Amino acid sequence: MTLAFQLAVFALIATSSILLIGVPVVFASPDGWSSNKNVVFSGTSLWIGLVFLVGILNSLIS
């Protein structure tokens, strides 16, 4: 269970880092938002899911 929690936290940190760099790049590019809207929404949905997963796993561990 601890390994699953650690992997979920790592995935959350990695996704946060990717979104931290990727979202401003998408907004700064001329046609970035219209062509990459689905990617940004998918990344945000993944991030929200990981936040809930980390919270659930944390409550099971402690």
Curated annotation (Swiss-Prot):
Pfam families from the UniProt entry: Ycf9
Annotated GO CC locations: chloroplast thylakoid membrane; photosystem II reaction center
Membrane topology: Multi-pass membrane protein
Transmembrane regions: 8-28, 41-61
Superkingdom of the organism of origin: Eukaryota
Keywords of the record: Chloroplast, Membrane, Photosynthesis, Photosystem II, Plastid, Reaction center, Thylakoid, Transmembrane, Transmembrane helix
Compartments (UniProt record): Plastid, Chloroplast thylakoid membrane
Cleaved signal peptide residues: none
Annotated GO biological process: photosynthesis; photosystem II stabilization
NCBIfam families referenced in this protein's UniProt entry, alphabetically: PS_II_psbZ
Role summary: May control the interaction of photosystem II (PSII) cores with the light-harvesting antenna, regulates electron flow through the 2 photosystem reaction centers. PSII is a light-driven water plastoquinone oxidoreductase, using light energy to abstract electrons from H(2)O, generating a proton gradient subsequently used for ATP formation.
Known partners and oligomeric status: PSII is composed of 1 copy each of membrane proteins PsbA, PsbB, PsbC, PsbD, PsbE, PsbF, PsbH, PsbI, PsbJ, PsbK, PsbL, PsbM, PsbT, PsbY, PsbZ, Psb30/Ycf12, at least 3 peripheral proteins of the oxygen-evolving complex and a large number of cofactors. It forms dimeric complexes.
Protein family (similarity comment): Belongs to the PsbZ family.
Name used for this protein in its record: Photosystem II reaction center protein Z
Organism encoding this protein: Helianthus annuus (Common sunflower)
Organismal lineage: Eukaryota, Viridiplantae, Streptophyta, Embryophyta, Tracheophyta
Primary gene name: psbZ
